C-alpha cells in the first residue's frame, strides 16, 4: 500500500514538472513566433505586409530568409517534444505555412492580379482596337522577375506584347527608354515599333542590338561578313586542292555519307511505332552509275558501299539484273542477283554474280527484318536463311559462279580487301581508279552533292558558335563517345573548315552575326548590363544558347530587369539554325522562378481544325499541354484531305482552286522549295522580290515553303505533296549525326520537329486547310490525321520460353548439340528456345566469341 502511494506521488510530481516545462517551452516558442511575426498566420501576414504588392521571387526569398531562424527553432522544439507542439496549434500552423510558403505567395499574387484586372478593366478594354482576353491581361499584370507567356497559333501574342508595353508606360509609369523590345526579324521589330510610337521605344533584332552595343562601347562599328555562304564555298575550293583533304572526302562519301539518311533499322522502328508504314523497298542512291551509265538505287547502305567499291576497283556491273536462266516457279519470282559483274576472259564475255546477305557473323538477320514483315524473329531468320540456301542451290544447279559478302564483312573486315580478294580469285581483272579521279567523279564542280556537302560544313561551323562550344569541346565529346565515324568526320573533314573560316574572318577584319552576339555578351558581362526595367522578347521558342547568354548579360543590374518572353513551343521549327526548345520548355531551370501564363484562345481559326491540330501536336509528350479553343463557338475551320493519282496532281489542284470563292486569299505551301516543280511546269510564274506567284484557274496565288509561312495566314491554305518518302513529309533525310555535337538535343519524339512544322502549316488557314497527297504513298501524318486509331503500338510477341532459366541439364544438352555440329536453327528447334537465346548462351559458356566470325549454318 505504501509502495503504491509512493508511485502515485512520484507520477503526480512528474506530471507537475512536465506541465511546468511544457508551459515554459510553449511560452518560449510562442514568444519566438510573436517576436518575429506578431502573428502566427503567415497567409494573413503576407497579405497584410505586402498589401497591394506583387511578391516576386526575390521578395519571397527575402521573406523566407527572415523567418528561417524562427522555423529552425520551432523544428528544434518539435524534435525534443512532439507533445508540446500539439498543445499549441498556432505554432504547428506556422511550421506548416512556412513549408508551404510558395503556395501562400502564389495565392497572394493571384489575388493581386485579380485586383489589378478590376482596377484597370477600362484600360484593357480600350488599349487596343478590341478588348484583350483574360489570359492576356493576367500575363500583362504579372510582376514576376521571369514571366513566360505560352501562346498558341493565332492567339494574339503580338497584342499581348503591345498591351504589356502600354501597361508599363501608362500604368506603371516606366520610361519607354527603359523598355527593351527584341524580336527575330527586322520586319517584326519594325512592326512593334510602328504599333507603339512612343519616343525612346524601339524594337530590335538580337543582331542589331548587339551591333549597337559593340559600336557604342568600343567606339568602332564592326565590319560584318554578310555573305558567309560564299566564304564556305571559297574554303571548300581551297581545301579541295589539298591531296590529303581530297582523300578524306573520298573516304567520307564512300564509308560514311549514307548515314545522312535514316538507317534501315531506325526507319523500321519509326514506321512500326507509327503503325503507318513506309514501304520496305526504300532505296539509297549509289555514288556512281552502273556500266550502262544508269543511276543505281540500292536497298541498303552496305549495298551502296559495294557499288562504290566495284567502281573504285574498275569493275563493270549491273544491279539486280535478271539471272541468265529462267528459274521462276510457283514459289519464286524470277531471280535477280544483287550484282551481276561483267568482264572479258580471253576475248569471251563472262559473268560473275555477287550477293550481299544481310546477316551477321552468326548468320542472324537484324531485328527489323521481323518487325517490317510482321513475323516473329525466328520466322524472319528462317525465311531469310532459306532464301540464301535457295540462291546458292540455283547457282550450283546451273553452274554459275557466285561470290558473297555479308553484313559481318562490313563489321569485322575491310570490305574492300575481302571483295578484291574474291574478285581476283574469280579471275575478274582489276583496274583500280586513282583517288583524284574518284574525287572528281564523286564531287563534280557545282553538283548537288557538292552543294549539300558545303552546306553541311557551313551548318556545323555556324552551330558550333550558336551553341557556344569550341572545337576542343566537340573533340572531347567525340573522344568520350569512342565513335570512329565521328572522330574521322570531325577531325579530318570539318575541323579544317572551321579553322580556315575563323582565319579568313580575322584576316579580313570581319565578324559574322553570331560573333556580334558573343561579343556584345562579353561587353555586357564586363561593363554591366543595359539600363532596363523590362526586357520583352517575341518568338521566344526560337531562342538559342548564344542569345540566352546575351539575355542574361543584358538584364544584369541592381535590380535586374524583368523578363517577359512570349512564344509557342508548338511552333518551334528552327533547330537546324540553333534554336533550343529546352530553353523554352524548361524556362525556370535556366532563368529561375517563373510565372508561366498560357494564352489559349485562337482568333484565327475554329473547330474542327482547332481540336484536330491540338490533338495532333500534343501526341508529342515533350510539348507543353494547352487547352486551345476558338474565340467563338460559331467559328468553323475545316481540314480536308484530297488524294490524287500519279499524274493527276495538277488536275486536282486546279479543281481545288476553282472551288475557292473569289475574293478569298489563298496560300500554297510546300515542305521544300522545289515542291513547286509541278506548278512551274504547268502554270505561269511571276516573281516579286522573294515572293513567288502562280496563275491557276485565272487567279494569282502565292507559293511559300512551310517554314516561311510561319506567322502568316490566309482564308484557304493548300498543303502540297504531303507524301511518304525520303523527300516527303515528314522528311526521312536525317541530319548528319555529327551535327548532334553542336545542335541542341532533340525532344526525342519521332519526327518531333517535322510534326511541329506540319502543325504550323495546317494552322495558317481561317476557313479551310486542304491537304493534298498521292494516294499510293500518303504521308504518315496524313494517315495519322485520317485514322488516329492506327497509332496504337503493335508489340512484338516474345518467344514463349523467353525468361526461362537455363539449368545445368540445359547447358549439357546445348554443349552436346553445338559440339556435334548442329546449327543454331536446329538447336533452337530441338531446345524450344529462340536462336538469339541459343547464341547468347553459347557466348556465356565461352563456346563462341561474339567479336569474331563463327561458322555459318
Question: Where are the model-predicted features located?
Answer:
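P-loop NTPase Walker
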Residues: 16-225, 763
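Short beta-strand-loop-alpha-helix junction that forms the active-site gateway
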Residues: 336-386, 569-570, 819
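Helicase P-loop NTPase motor core
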Residues: 148, 158-161, 273, 282, ...
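Conserved P-loop NTPase-based nucleic-acid remodeling module centered on helicase motor cores
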Residues: 37-45, 49, 53, 178, ...
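Conserved helicase NTPase motor core
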Residues: 78, 95-153, 161, 202, ...
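Conserved helicase C-terminal RecA-like lobe
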Residues: 661-665, 700, 704, 708-775, ...
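Conserved RecA-like helicase ATPase core segment
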Residues: 387-388, 392-393, 546-637
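Basic/charged alpha-beta structural segments of nucleotide/phosphate-handling enzymes
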Residues: 58-106, 231-284, 412-500
Amino acid at each position: 500500500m505504501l509502495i503504491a502511494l509512493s508511485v502515485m506521488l512520484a507520477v503526480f510530481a512528474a506530471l507537475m514538472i512536465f506541465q511546468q516545462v511544457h508551459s515554459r517551452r510553449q511560452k518560449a516558442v510562442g514568444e519566438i513566433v510573436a517576436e518575429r511575426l506578431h502573428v502566427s498566420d503567415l497567409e494573413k501576414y503576407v497579405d497584410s505586409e505586402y498589401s497591394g504588392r506583387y511578391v516576386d521571387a526575390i521578395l519571397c526569398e527575402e521573406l523566407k530568409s527572415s523567418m528561417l531562424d524562427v522555423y529552425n527553432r520551432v523544428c528544434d522544439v518539435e524534435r525534443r517534444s512532439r507533445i508540446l507542439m500539439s498543445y499549441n496549434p498556432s505554432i504547428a500552423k506556422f511550421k506548416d505555412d512556412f513549408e508551404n510558403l510558395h503556395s501562400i505567395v502564389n495565392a497572394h499574387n493571384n489575388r493581386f492580379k485579380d485586383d489589378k484586372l478590376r482596377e484597370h478593366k477600362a484600360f484593357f478594354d480600350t488599349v487596343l482596337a478590341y478588348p484583350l482576353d483574360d489570359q492576356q491581361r493576367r500575363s500583362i499584370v504579372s510582376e514576376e522577375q521571369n514571366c513566360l507567356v505560352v501562346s498558341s497559333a493565332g492567339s494574339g501574342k503580338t497584342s499581348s506584347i503591345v498591351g504589356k508595353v502600354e501597361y508599363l508606360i501608362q500604368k506603371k509609369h516606366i520610361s519607354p527608354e527603359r523598355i527593351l523590345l527584341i524580336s527575330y526579324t527586322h520586319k517584326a521589330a519594325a512592326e512593334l515599333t510602328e504599333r507603339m510610337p512612343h519616343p525612346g521605344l524601339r524594337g530590335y533584332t538580337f543582331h542589331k542590338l548587339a551591333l549597337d552595343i559593340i559600336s557604342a562601347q568600343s567606339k568602332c562599328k564592326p565590319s560584318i561578313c554578310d555573305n558567309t555562304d560564299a566564304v564556305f564555298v571559297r574554303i571548300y575550293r581551297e581545301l579541295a586542292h589539298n591531296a590529303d583533304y581530297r582523300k578524306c572526302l573520298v573516304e567520307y562519301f564512300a564509308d560514311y555519307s549514307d548515314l545522312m539518311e535514316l538507317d534501315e533499322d531506325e526507319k523500321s522502328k519509326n514506321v512500326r511505332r507509327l503503325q503507318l508504314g513506309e514501304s520496305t523497298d526504300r532505296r539509297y542512291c549509289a555514288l556512281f552509275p552502273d556500266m550502262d551509265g544508269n543511276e543505281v538505287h540500292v536497298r541498303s547502305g552496305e549495298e551502296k558501299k559495294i557499288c562504290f567499291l566495284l567502281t573504285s576497283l574498275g569493275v563493270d556491273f549491273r544491279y539486280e539484273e535478271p539471272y541468265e536462266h529462267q528459274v521462276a516457279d510457283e514459289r519464286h519470282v524470277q531471280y535477280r542477283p544483287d550484282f551481276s559483274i561483267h568482264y572479258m576472259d580471253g576475248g569471251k564475255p563472262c559473268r560473275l554474280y555477287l550477293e550481299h546477305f544481310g546477316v551477321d557473323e552468326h548468320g542472324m538477320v537484324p531485328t527489323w527484318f521481323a518487325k517490317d514483315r510482321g513475323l516473329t524473329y525466328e520466322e524472319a531468320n528462317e525465311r531469310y536463311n532459306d532464301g540464301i540456301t535457295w540462291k546458292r542451290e540455283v547457282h550450283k544447279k546451273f553452274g554459275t559462279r557466285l561470290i558473297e559478302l555479308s553484313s559481318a564483312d562490313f563489321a569485322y573486315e575491310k570490305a574492300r580487301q575481302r571483295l578484291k580478294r574474291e574478285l581476283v580469285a574469280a579471275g575478274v581483272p582489276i583496274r583500280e581508279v586513282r583517288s583524284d579521279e574518284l574525287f572528281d567523279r564523286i564531287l563534280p564542280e557545282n553538283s548537288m552533292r557538292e552543294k549539300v556537302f558545303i552546306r553541311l560544313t557551313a551548318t556545323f561551323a555556324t552551330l558550333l558558335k550558336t551553341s557556344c562550344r569550341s572545337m576542343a569541346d566537340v573533340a572531347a565529346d567525340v573522344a568520350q563517345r569512342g565513335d570512329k565515324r565521328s572522330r574521322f568526320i570531325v577531325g579530318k573533314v570539318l575541323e579544317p573548315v572551321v579553322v580556315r573560316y575563323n582565319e579568313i574572318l580575322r584576316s579580313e577584319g570581319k565578324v559574322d552575326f553570331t560573333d556580334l552576339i558573343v561579343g556584345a555578351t562579353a561587353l555586357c558581362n564586363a561593363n554591366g548590363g543595359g539600363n532596363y526595367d523590362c526586357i520583352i522578347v517575341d518568338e521566344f521558342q526560337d531562342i538559342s544558347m548564344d542569345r540566352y547568354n546575351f539575355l542574361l548579360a543584358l538584364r544584369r543590374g541592381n535590380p535586374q530587369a524583368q523578363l517577359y518572353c512570349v512564344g509557342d513551343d508548338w511552333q518551334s521549327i528552327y533547330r537546324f539554325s540553333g534554336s533550343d526548345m529546352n530553353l523554352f520548355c524548361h524556362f525556370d531551370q535556366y532563368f529561375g522562378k517563373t510565372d508561366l501564363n498560357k494564352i489559349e484562345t485562337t482568333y484565327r481559326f475554329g473547330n474542327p481544325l482547332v481540336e484536330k491540330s491540338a490533338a495532333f501536336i500534343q501526341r508529342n509528350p515533350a510539348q507543353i499541354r494547352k487547352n486551345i479553343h476558338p474565340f467563338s463557338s460559331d467559328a468553323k475551320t475545316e481540314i480536308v484531305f484530297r488524294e490524287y493519282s500519279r499524274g493527276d496532281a495538277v488536275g486536282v489542284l486546279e479543281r481545288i482552286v476553282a472551288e475557292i470563292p473569289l475574293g478569298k486569299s489563298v496560300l500554297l505551301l510546300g515542305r521544300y522549295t522545289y515542291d513547286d516543280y509541278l506548278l512551274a511546269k504547268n502554270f505561269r510564274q511571276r516573281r516579286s522580290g522573294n515572293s513567288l506567284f502562280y496563275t491557276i484557274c485565272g487567279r494569282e496565288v502565292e507559293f511559300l515553303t512551310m517554314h516561311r509561312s510561319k506567322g502568316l495566314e490566309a482564308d484557304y491554305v493548300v498543303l502540297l505533296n504531303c507524301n511518304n518518302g525520303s523527300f516527303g513529309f515528314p522528311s526521312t533525310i536525317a541530319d548528319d549525326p555529327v551535327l548532334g555535337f553542336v545542335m541542341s538535343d532533340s525532344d526525342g519524339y519521332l519526327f518531333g520537329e517535322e510534326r511541329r512544322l506540319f502543325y504550323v502549316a495546317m494552322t495558317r488557314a481561317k476557313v479551310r486547310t486542304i491537304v493534298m497527297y498521292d494516294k499510293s504513298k500518303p504521308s504518315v501524318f496524313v494517315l495519322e490525321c485520317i485514322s488516329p486509331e492506327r497509332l496504337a503500338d503493335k508489340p512484338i510477341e516474345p518467344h514463349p520460353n523467353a525468361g526461362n532459366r537455363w539449368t545445368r541439364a540445359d547447358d549439357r544438352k546445348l554443349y552436346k548439340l553445338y559440339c556435334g555440329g548442329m546449327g543454331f536453327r536446329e538447336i533452337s528447334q530441338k531446345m524450344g528456345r529462340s536462336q538469339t537465346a541459343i547464341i547468347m548462351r553459347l557466348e556465356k559458356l565461352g563456346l563462341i566469341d561474339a567479336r569474331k566470325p563463327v561458322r555459318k549454318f
